[in-house]
Amino acid sequence: MRVDLFDFDLPDERIALRPAEPRDSARLLVVDPNAEMVLSDRQIRDLSSYLRPGDAIVFNDTKVIPAQLEGIRHREGAPGQQVSATLHMRAAPDRWKAFAKPGKRIKIGDRIQFGHGENVCALGALDAVVEEKGEGGEITLRFDLSGPALDEAIAAVGHIPLPPYIAAKRPEDERDRADYQTIYAREEGAVAAPTAGLHFTPSLFATLDAMGVERHFVTLHVGAGTFLPVKADDTEDHKMHFEIGHVDAATAEKLNAVKARGGRIVCVGTTSLRLLESAAAEDGTIKPWSGATGIFITPGYRFKTVDLLMTNFHLPRSTLFMLVSAFAGLDTMRAAYTHAIETGYRFYSYGDGSLLHRKD
């Protein structure tokens, strides 16, 4: 499909720079392409009105790490150069794939010293060697540290990698360490938050528990590739970056039981949906799954297992807007986004949410 079909104009003032407080006071646009009244304006705390006892909500419990690293590149016979690296996928206990700037000037064999000056951690400077170099500024870093020691050093010297559309307007600060994390995050490894989950509060969880809605957790470590623009003119030519995740056997069994007795699967976030669709067989059965997924969902895709999707408002021409258009219909989502822009919904990671019903 032509990528320009997924383009739209978004006024700059619609980009949220801070989350709503409290989290569940954010607005919720309910989109049901199968109903007479397709669009309904609500709040996140009204979510329970659209769920039934026996439904299951699936959350991504990945935890954001401070994956934005600043350092100095060292090369024999050349002056040191400032380098920025955003870690996006762990390749081994001592290796990370990263997007580097300025990427063109980095060579295989370069040594980069992260955490210098005031940012040196208790373990000393964090050193890495460029082991591989790919396209678009992607590199593979082999660190001198490994495993938990490397994790500790990254946590000490790294910064929260705010989405570019927020970082362009203000610097990351201490509030973001809490704001850019879900209340249920537990599996460290993401470099971007599964942002639909940012809306949930203990109070909302209690409401859902009381009405008999099940809660289940899967893990997909969101990579920095989620922020990359689609540069191709046709979706067939776009290359997705891979992300690591898993669905354990117990969760798969429980979700299959929900479907068998007539309950619905409600995914919180596109990451949860992409992971479940990666783990689902053609008949909709969810299998235990572990590995890297590069699933790219566009209109025409046949969804196997997910019935409803809660998600934030996405970038024009993004793979995520393509996904929601596949789920609820392109014309429906274009109309929904036009309504959201005209009525003041807040967009992107810290913005408002939507609840999408899958198009019949």
Swiss-Prot record:
Keyword presence, S-adenosyl-L-methionine: yes
Q: Does S-adenosyl-L-methionine show up as a keyword for this record?
A: yes
The signal peptide stretch is none
**Which reaction equations make up its catalytic activity?**
7-aminomethyl-7-carbaguanosine(34) in tRNA + S-adenosyl-L-methionine = epoxyqueuosine(34) in tRNA + adenine + L-methionine + 2 H(+)
Q: Which GO terms label this protein's molecular function in UniProt?
A: S-adenosylmethionine:tRNA ribosyltransferase-isomerase activity
Cellular component terms, GO, for this chain's entry?
cytoplasm
Places the protein is found: Cytoplasm
**Assigned EC number:** 2.4.99.17
Task: Give the principal location in a single coarse category.
Answer: cytoplasm
State the top-level EC class. Answer: transferase
Which keywords are on file for this protein?
Cytoplasm, Queuosine biosynthesis, S-adenosyl-L-methionine, Transferase
**Single GO biological process annotation from the record:** tRNA wobble guanine modification
Q: In which pathway does it act?
A: tRNA modification; tRNA-queuosine biosynthesis
User: Could you name the domain of life of the organism this protein comes from?
Assistant: Bacteria
* A Pfam short name: Queuosine_synth
Q: Which PANTHER family match?
A: S-ADENOSYLMETHIONINE:TRNA RIBOSYLTRANSFERASE-ISOMERASE
Fill in the subunit field for this protein.
Monomer.
Family named by the database record: Belongs to the QueA family.
Describe the task this protein carries out.
Transfers and isomerizes the ribose moiety from AdoMet to the 7-aminomethyl group of 7-deazaguanine (preQ1-tRNA) to give epoxyqueuosine (oQ-tRNA).
Q: What is this protein called?
A: S-adenosylmethionine:tRNA ribosyltransferase-isomerase
List the source organism: Rhizobium rhizogenes (strain K84 / ATCC BAA-868)
